């Protein structure tokens, strides 16, 4: 006998502007009759509830696929932890703050970030504001600028860490799915259904560049649409690393990436770059 679904925990999440929003039902066992020779079952159909968002493996997915609800929830949890740290620790030095922040606050803002990484300036600033406010808890650093506080604490911006995590995930995928044919020096996909389309023409850039497909506003938030423009700008030495550790080391030195301590959406950093 197979385990049946708990219909009360099953929901329907409709995606897409043109979705027809059909009703869906699951069979639910309602009656069992046992005899000396057999067992008979009676089923009834349970209509599944329609929802606008659903949490799966710790990530809240909404019907617009913009993950604003998930981002708001994680910011709220991170702020709650900051409030506890501020109340329970009257004095924080740099070492103690780094330990508490990295273990209790930052994980809320980074868990599964390649899935929900924000694409709007508003959401990027909202997430970064948590770390901006947190770094002021160290009394000796509270009067410094945000960039100076990050340098003193050796904390990269959350924006930089999300970009780095995206690139690491893409590197791992490429190592498993894309190979370089030594006879033709062309890229070949091991899997015909690969989500990446190698660029076979042109001499500029590294040999593992991929085509950025046309996309709608919703698709613009997808992983490949977000990370491929950054990946294609990386240096050849970085993308041809023979191990993950070498790739991570290359990211720290790659000239195409911004400084890990400068928040690119900070007005002060924008002015300094223009000068």
Predicted regions and their residues:
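Amphipathic alpha-helical
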Residues: 45, 180-226
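Short, conserved micro-motifs composed of acidic
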Residues: 4-52
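Short, charged alpha-helical motifs in flexible N/C-terminal segments and linkers
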Residues: 2-14, 123-195
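Short, conserved catalytic/metal-binding micro-motifs enriched in Asp/Glu and His
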Residues: 56-64, 78, 105, 109-116, ...
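Charged/polar positions within long, soluble alpha-helices
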Residues: 3, 83, 87-90, 110, ...
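Conserved, non-catalytic sequence blocks in retroelement Pol enzymes and Pol-derived host proteins
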Residues: 65-74, 88-99, 117-127, 155-161, ...
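Basic, alpha-helical interaction scaffolds
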Residues: 45-115
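C-terminal helix/juxtamembrane-tail motif
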Residues: 40-42, 242, 248-275
């Amino acid at each position: 006998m197979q385990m049946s679904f708990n219909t009360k925990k099953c929901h329907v999440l409709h995606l897409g502007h043109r979705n027809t929003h059909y009703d869906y039902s699951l069979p639910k066992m309602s009656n069992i009759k046992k005899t000396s020779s057999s067992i008979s079952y009676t089923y009834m159909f349970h209509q599944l509830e329609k929802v606008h968002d659903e949490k799966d493996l710790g990530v809240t997915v909404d019907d617009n696929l913009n993950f604003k609800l998930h981002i708001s929830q994680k910011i709220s949890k991170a702020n709650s932890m900051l409030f506890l740290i501020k109340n329970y620790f009257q004095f924080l030095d740099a070492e103690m703050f780094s330990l508490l922040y990295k273990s209790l606050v930052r994980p809320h803002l980074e868990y599964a970030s390649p899935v929900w990484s924000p694409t709007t300036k508003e959401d990027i600033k909202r997430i970064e504001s948590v770390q901006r406010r947190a770094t002021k808890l160290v009394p000796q650093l509270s009067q410094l600028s945000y960039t100076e506080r990050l340098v003193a604490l050796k904390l990269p911006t959350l924006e930089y860490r999300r970009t780095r995590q995206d690139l690491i995930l893409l590197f791992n995928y490429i190592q498993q799915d894309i190979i370089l044919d030594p006879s033709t020096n062309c890229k070949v996909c091991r899997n015909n259904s690969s989500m990446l389309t190698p660029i076979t023409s042109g001499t500029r850039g590294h040999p593992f560049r991929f085509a950025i497909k046309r996309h709608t506003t919703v698709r613009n938030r997808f992983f490949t649409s977000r990370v491929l423009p950054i990946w294609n700008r990386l240096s050849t030495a970085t993308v041809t690393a023979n191990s993950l550790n070498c790739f991570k080391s290359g990211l720290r030195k790659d000239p195409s990436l911004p400084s890990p301590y400068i928040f690119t959406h900070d007005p002060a950093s924008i002015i300094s770059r223009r000068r």
